[in-house]
């Protein structure tokens, strides 16, 4: 139970980055919200926000993947340098969805050779089948919003800082000579987890805030 609570705590902190400020995310050092549709040639522009539903084919995903592939690397956060870097040349490999969309995401991204056995319709070609990991985010309550993320091993977007590890520390005062046990037959447990979560970079992250 304590281990699951620790996992849910980490999940909650990361999920909140995508949903705070009505889905725009936190304000970055460049003055722009994490997710916005402003061009990169403008201060604070991240051009990583759309409003298209995930759908039942790859139209929406292709648009997001292409936009992320073309995003320019940071040269300098100063006038005259905005949006002048080289394209990052990376496509997303993770699709984050609420529980309401996980079936639709799996229908798009499970390996096509598994589709007959799993009774999942092959809605399109094998272009993305087996190349994208659909992940349901328990804390997301909006049934239509979704996000795309580049493999964090290639370019991390969210960073987790920890002391003593991500796994919670569990302390038990259950010895027969502990005061609580000796006096009151109580076995006391303390769970401790030191974490900090923040945005490392907007380039690997893209959000679709869908109306409805």
Where are these regions (language model features)?
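Sequence/fold signature of self-assembling virion shell proteins
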Residues: 42-78, 91-94, 99-212
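Short gly/pro-enriched beta-turn/loop segments at secondary-structure junctions
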Residues: 83-92
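Alpha-helical scaffold segments that mediate packing/assembly in large oligomeric complexes
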Residues: 1-74
